[in-house]
Design a protein with these regions (language model features):
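Alpha-helical cap/lid subdomain in secreted, periplasmic
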Residues: 2, 61-155
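Glycine-centered flexibility motif
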Residues: 11, 17, 53, 129, ...
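Solvent-exposed loop/turn segments at secondary-structure junctions
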Residues: 13-16, 42, 51-56, 82-86, ...
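Conserved phosphate-coordination/catalytic loops
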Residues: 28-29, 53, 57, 107-110
Length: 155
């Protein structure tokens, strides 16, 4: 396998290094994902084109634009999924018995990801896929539901 010297990171807030500040409860970019160490230890250059709120649908559009402009890299790290599988929690709280779909339904998520992978491979760019980090369900639920009727959301 060839040395992947030029890497582009394409994903959501996790790959961007955005976290919630425990004091202010606001989003901050901390960049504690170790890109400088990776560049140094593995002789890489990494350009982080990740975006807050990105899903596979937005990622596919971003990748298309990058490819049209002549994306010059050896590999693309892709980290999507968290925003794809999110729900509109206020709508769930207002109508818990109704059907609610994730932001990007699973068939579209699969189609978008496969399309991105295929486009990269056609250009001899290695797709590097990551998986979501584990989350703490109670903290996640409390954060996203906030002041909503959590009992209704649980139904």
């Amino acid at each position: 396998m060839k040395h992947l010297a030029r890497i582009v990171a394409l994903g959501d807030s996790i790959l961007k290094g955005i976290q919630v500040d425990p004091e202010t409860k606001r989003y901050v970019t901390r960049n504690e994902i170790g890109i400088p160490a990776l560049e140094r230890d593995f002789d890489l250059t990494v350009r982080n084109d990740s975006h807050f709120g990105a899903s596979t649908v937005k990622g596919a559009r971003l990748l298309d634009r990058m490819l049209e402009r002549g994306l010059a890299c050896d590999g693309v790290v892709m980290d999507f999924g968290g925003n794809d599988c999110d729900f509109k929690w206020a709508e769930i709280a207002a109508a818990p018995a109704a059907e609610h779909l994730p932001a990007v339904p699973l068939p579209e998520f699969i189609r978008s990801y496969r399309s991105m992978i295929g486009k990269l491979r056609q250009r001899d760019i290695v797709p590097i896929l990551t998986t979501l980090p584990p989350l703490e369900p109670e903290l996640f639920f409390d954060w996203w539901c906030g002041r909503l009727d959590q009992g209704a959301v649980h139904r």
